[in-house]
């Protein structure tokens, strides 16, 4: 079971590396990693389990965040009622296209690997088209928008050596383009 002490923290070079693609069939080790990453997200969103194990809630977890520099990320995205609206493990994801219009979260973003609060808007594409492989090697292409697109973009950034605060305007952290959609 992945716990908070297993999460790679900001400052570790693995978080700034471009993760290597995986080949299929996945080894048992990587299949277990995928399961463990998803289980962390499930556990972290369950208040009783999260409190018992002192887990910070997460909606996404990329392999570099647990010290593995490989192209894999788990996403477990709830809606505002707590119902899961997107659940998947991406292997070797690639953004095929993205909207010009940007979106961001009103409260900014956080990250399991970043312990401090970093204020500012994190503009991301409002819509994404992503090609990825499942753990079983099935190729899929999906379209995401709004919050699921934000989460997917955040996790794919991890696979490319970027952290959310890299996207914050350094001169004016709360400045946005006029047509940016702010999600509360």
UniProtKB/Swiss-Prot annotation:
It catalyses: N-terminal N-formyl-L-methionyl-[peptide] + H2O = N-terminal L-methionyl-[peptide] + formate. It comes from the Bacteria. Binds 1 Fe(2+) ion. The active site is at residue 155. Keywords: Hydrolase, Iron, Metal-binding, Protein biosynthesis. Its cofactor is Fe(2+). GO terms for biological process: co-translational protein modification; translation. GO terms for molecular function: metal ion binding; peptide deformylase activity. It is an enzyme of class 3 (hydrolase). Its EC number is 3.5.1.88. Transmembrane segments: none annotated. Gene3D superfamilies: Peptide deformylase. Fe cation binds at residues 111, 154, 158. PANTHER family: PEPTIDE DEFORMYLASE (PTHR10458), PEPTIDE DEFORMYLASE 2 (PTHR10458:SF8). Removes the formyl group from the N-terminal Met of newly synthesized proteins. Requires at least a dipeptide for an efficient rate of reaction. N-terminal L-methionine is a prerequisite for activity but the enzyme has broad specificity at other positions. Belongs to the polypeptide deformylase family. This is Peptide deformylase. It comes from Lactobacillus johnsonii (strain CNCM I-12250 / La1 / NCC 533). The lineage of its organism: Bacteria, Bacillati, Bacillota, Bacilli, Lactobacillales. The gene is def.
């Amino acid at each position: 079971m992945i716990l908070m002490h297993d999460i790679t923290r900001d400052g570790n070079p693995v978080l700034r590396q471009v993760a290597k693609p995986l080949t299929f069939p996945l080894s048992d080790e990587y299949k277990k990693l995928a399961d463990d990453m998803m289980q962390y997200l499930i556990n972290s969103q369950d208040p009783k389990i999260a409190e018992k194990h002192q887990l910070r809630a997460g909606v996404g977890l990329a392999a570099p965040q647990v010290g593995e520099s490989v192209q894999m990320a788990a996403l477990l995205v709830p809606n505002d009622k707590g119902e899961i609206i997107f659940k998947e493990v991406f292997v070797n994801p690639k953004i095929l296209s993205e909207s010009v219009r940007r979106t961001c979260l009103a409260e900014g973003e956080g990250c399991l690997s970043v312990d401090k609060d970093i204020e500012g808007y994190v503009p991301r594409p409002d819509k994404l088209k992503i090609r990825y492989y499942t753990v079983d090697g099935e190729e899929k292409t999906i379209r995401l928008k709004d919050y699921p697109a934000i989460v997917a973009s955040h996790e794919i950034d991890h696979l490319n050596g970027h952290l959310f605060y890299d996207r914050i305007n350094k001169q004016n952290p709360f400045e946005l383009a006029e047509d940016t959609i702010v999600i509360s």
